[in-house]
Amino acid sequence: MIAANFLLNLFLYPILIKLFRRRRIGQYIRKEGPDLHGYKEGTPTMGGILFVLTGFLFGMISKTTTMVLLGMFLFFLIGFLDDFLSVVRKDSTGLKTYQKALLQTLSALIMLLLIRPETNVDFFGFTIEMGKWYYLFALLVIVGSSNAMNLTDGLDGLAGWIYVSGSIPYWFFLKERGVSEDILLILGAGVLAFLVFNSKPAKIFMGDTGSITLGGVLGTVSVLTKTEFYLVLFFLIPVIETLSVILQVGSFKIFKRRIFRMSPLHHHFELIGWSEEKIVAVFTVFNLVSSLVVLEIFGVIA
């Protein structure tokens, strides 16, 4: 099924790209973004719609946990709506920040009410009972994961390669713990096919349809498998990207000074002269090494 999903996406993406170009479903570049990105204006977007829908299909066939599929569907709707509004309005805004946050929070709450997870967490081998506070923690994990992947999706190929570099080791880690979440690999196969057309110069972008969904799935899987803290190490780059935004905003509001030339962090490296290809390569290797270190520490690989 993993290979089938890869081949299906590889076959369908050229068709989707032609269709989106014909329908002028293109990316609008935000004005506050780097000037270097001006040439990307009009590149087909919402490309995540394909690997998400095929992932959902093969996920159902592989009997993926219903809650994971539900989470995928809910976050897909948010990402799709955001991209759809951007295309219709012909600007980069889409949903407003508070609207997106509200929808993500509501989706996560629905998930938690249905999952009713145990209220303890595994803090790298130490079990901590959080009681009712766990629900707030889990809410932050799911919404935070969704936003972190969304923030990472700012360069050609970056979010896709980060997902692949983290999800495959994460799957092995869960397998070692007796949990099978094949949806991670199924989605990864679709993302790999997408990367054939998303690597610089990108012929299509995943849009929020893809990035918000990928992050939502990761957050949901971590809550279901009680691996919330481990998820951070398998996807360290999205965490760092998110922290760079928080630090940048906080520093400017409090001290009226910026820490980075621009946030998220990948834009900072762009503005100091790194090429997109170099940033994507360095970030991907960093994320992969972090993931492999986790596997080594916890005895998954000898």
Swiss-Prot record:
The keyword Magnesium applies. Pathway: Cell wall biogenesis; peptidoglycan biosynthesis. Its cofactor is Mg(2+). GO terms for molecular function: metal ion binding; phospho-N-acetylmuramoyl-pentapeptide-transferase activity; UDP-N-acetylmuramoyl-L-alanyl-D-glutamyl-meso-2,6-diaminopimelyl-D-alanyl-D-alanine:undecaprenyl-phosphate transferase activity. The chain crosses the membrane at residues 1-21, 42-62, 68-88, 123-143, 154-174, 178-198, 204-224, 229-249, 279-299. It is found in: Cell inner membrane. Its EC number is 2.7.8.13. The keyword Transmembrane helix applies. Keywords: Cell cycle, Cell division, Cell inner membrane, Cell membrane, Cell shape, Cell wall biogenesis/degradation, Magnesium, Membrane, Metal-binding, Peptidoglycan synthesis, Transferase, Transmembrane, Transmembrane helix. GO terms for cellular component: plasma membrane. It comes from the Bacteria. GO terms for biological process: cell division; cell wall organization; peptidoglycan biosynthetic process; regulation of cell shape. InterPro entries: Glycosyl_transferase_4, PNAcMuramoyl-5peptid_Trfase, PNAcMuramoyl-5peptid_Trfase_CS. It is a multi-pass membrane protein. It catalyses: UDP-N-acetyl-alpha-D-muramoyl-L-alanyl-gamma-D-glutamyl-meso-2,6-diaminopimeloyl-D-alanyl-D-alanine + di-trans,octa-cis-undecaprenyl phosphate = di-trans,octa-cis-undecaprenyl diphospho-N-acetyl-alpha-D-muramoyl-L-alanyl-D-glutamyl-meso-2,6-diaminopimeloyl-D-alanyl-D-alanine + UMP. HAMAP family: MraY. Catalyzes the initial step of the lipid cycle reactions in the biosynthesis of the cell wall peptidoglycan: transfers peptidoglycan precursor phospho-MurNAc-pentapeptide from UDP-MurNAc-pentapeptide onto the lipid carrier undecaprenyl phosphate, yielding undecaprenyl-pyrophosphoryl-MurNAc-pentapeptide, known as lipid I. Belongs to the glycosyltransferase 4 family. MraY subfamily. This is Phospho-N-acetylmuramoyl-pentapeptide-transferase.
